[in-house]
Design a protein with these regions (language model features):
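Active-site-proximal alpha-helix that buttresses catalytic centers in soluble enzyme cores
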Residues: 1-44, 50
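Short, amphipathic alpha-helical "lid/cap" segments that border enzyme active or binding sites
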Residues: 4-8, 102-109
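Alpha-helical structural signal in soluble globular domains
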Residues: 10, 30-37, 64, 68, ...
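An alpha-helix initiation/capping motif
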Residues: 21-28, 59, 99-102, 106
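Short, well-ordered beta-to-alpha junction loops that form the rim of enzyme active sites
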Residues: 21-25, 47-48, 77, 123-127
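Active-site-adjacent alpha-helix immediately C-terminal to a catalytic or transition-state-stabilizing loop
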Residues: 28, 39, 105-150
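Phosphate-handling substructures
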Residues: 34-103
Length: 150
């Protein structure tokens, strides 16, 4: 939590036009610590979830998340958002291939490139972010990234 408080102070002077958060519980908690006041333009986006590789990367269904995090809008999430929307036995881990992860990163880059907002914060995960910036960040470390706007 101390890391999130430090990051909150570092980011306090930035007027973000859009905030994006992964739907994994740990990220929603981190997001809430960094941005404690509700911000109008916040999107919970499954594209920025972690690489599905371990049990900690398995998500929860939107109706369950909504009860725990009522200030977020989960209406754009499908029931099995952490498994590329494919139904599964929730007690199993269907690992995501690196190829599938990279395809998801490309879809995110395409999505971000068509946004009108210029100042965007993305609260996501190490492996996902590393596939964009080509190195790993420490917990609660931030990096400024300039996407290839067309």
């Amino acid at each position: 939590k101390n890391e999130t408080i430090k990051l909150r102070k570092l980011l306090a002077g930035i007027d973000f036009e859009l905030l994006i958060c992964s739907p994994l519980t740990r990220t929603l908690q981190t997001f809430t610590n960094i941005f404690p006041k509700p911000i109008k333009n916040t999107k919970v986006l499954s594209l920025v979830r972690e690489h599905l590789d371990h049990s900690c990367d398995v998500g929860r269904q939107p109706n369950i998340l909504q009860k725990e995090f009522p200030h977020f809008d989960f209406s754009e999430l499908n029931k099995y958002w952490w498994n590329n929307d494919v139904p599964l036995d929730e007690n199993e881990i269907n690992q995501e291939s690196i190829h599938d992860l990279d395809q998801r990163v490309l879809r995110f880059k395409e999505w971000i490139n068509i946004r009108k907002e210029k100042t965007i914060a993305v609260v996501s995960h190490g492996t996902f972010i590393s596939r964009i910036i080509y190195f790993f960040l420490d917990n609660c470390e931030f990096e400024i990234w300039y996407p290839d706007k067309k």
